[in-house]
């Protein structure tokens, strides 16, 4: 794994942790539970995977170093319990850290407020 990829992963992860900390009260008000599913860092790949659960649906936020997936660094998906259409956001190979964080923030806010 390239050092540049790991640095980008770490920057995204750090900002996501801050974003969730800033939304902690709002998550609590909306009875949304958070579970850290995976927090792995090694020489080959890094994973930080969070699940959010409410009485309306479940969400998974994944941050990884690039590997063979439909996204590059980040993925956010929501599955609604009332069978509404699922929500997906995937970054692209040329997405900047700022773009990724903006879209993850927007996605998490959408889940919290729905």
PLM region spans:
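Amphipathic, interaction-prone secondary-structure segments
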Residues: 31-77
């Amino acid at each position: 794994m390239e050092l540049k990829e790991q640095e980008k992963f770490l920057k995204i992860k750090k900002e996501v942790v801050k974003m969730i900390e800033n939304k902690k009260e709002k998550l609590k008000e909306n009875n949304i539970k958070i579970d850290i599913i995976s927090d792995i860092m090694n020489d080959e790949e890094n994973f930080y995977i969070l699940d959010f659960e409410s009485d309306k649906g479940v969400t998974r936020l994944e941050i990884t170093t690039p590997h063979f997936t439909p996204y590059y660094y980040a993925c956010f998906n929501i599955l609604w319990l009332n069978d509404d259409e699922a929500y997906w956001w995937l970054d692209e190979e040329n997405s900047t850290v700022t773009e990724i964080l903006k879209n993850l923030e927007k996605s998490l806010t959408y889940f919290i407020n729905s």
